[in-house]
């Protein structure tokens, strides 16, 4: 995660660091856009806290999160990038009145703005960008059985992570108008595709 943050920091013009509540926020510009970076940590709680801190201190119009995910679709290759069209939880069950993965009182899925997804998918370069569903849960997918269990509920899932849906839910609750997640597919989990 430190490596990812360092790479993103190189994109900023004249970056500065602010420390708030024990967290470092890196501020700068990309062209005319003000950008704030932070490292949230692994898991739903860390990512939700990071999202709340970002919203509280900087009031973003757009929240973009990035990380490394396991590929849930056998057509994906290592280093392909999945851009969320929607996010949901793969480990939530609130009874038969809710969809599997839905938290009671929340949408079943948190949709990303279609225009941003289309822009990301249209980017040209050496890396393939694939739009699709990202599912989040509180455990590493380190076996074929775990991946099969996820795909039984979400056969259309493109990637699996531990943060994207909790950030999307936090943005939904706090009224952040736009959110989407960018995941680089990691080699370790790609090998765990359910066949």
Q: Model segments located where?
A:
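Short connector loops/turns at beta-strand edges and beta->alpha or beta->beta junctions
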Residues: 88, 183-187
């Amino acid at each position: 995660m430190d490596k990812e943050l360092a790479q993103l920091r190189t994109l900023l013009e004249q970056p500065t660091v602010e420390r708030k509540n024990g967290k470092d926020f890196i501020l700068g510009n990309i062209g005319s856009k003000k950008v704030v970076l932070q490292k949230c940590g692994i898991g739903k709680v860390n990512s939700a806290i990071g999202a709340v801190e970002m919203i509280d201190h900087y009031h973003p119009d757009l929240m973009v999160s990035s990380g490394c995910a396991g590929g849930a679709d056998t057509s994906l290759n290592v280093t392909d990038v999945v851009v969320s069209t929607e996010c949901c939880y793969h480990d939530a069950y609130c009874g038969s009145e809710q969809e599997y993965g839905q938290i009671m009182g929340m949408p079943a899925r948190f949709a990303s703005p279609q225009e941003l997804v289309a822009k990301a998918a249209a980017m040209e370069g050496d890396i393939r960008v694939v739009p699709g569903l990202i599912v989040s849960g509180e455990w590493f997918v380190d076996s074929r059985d775990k991946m099969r269990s996820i795909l039984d509920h979400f056969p259309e899932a493109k990637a699996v992570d531990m943060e994207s849906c909790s950030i999307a839910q936090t943005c939904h609750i706090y009224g952040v108008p736009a959110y989407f997640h960018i995941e680089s597919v990691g080699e370790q989990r790609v090998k765990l595709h359910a066949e």
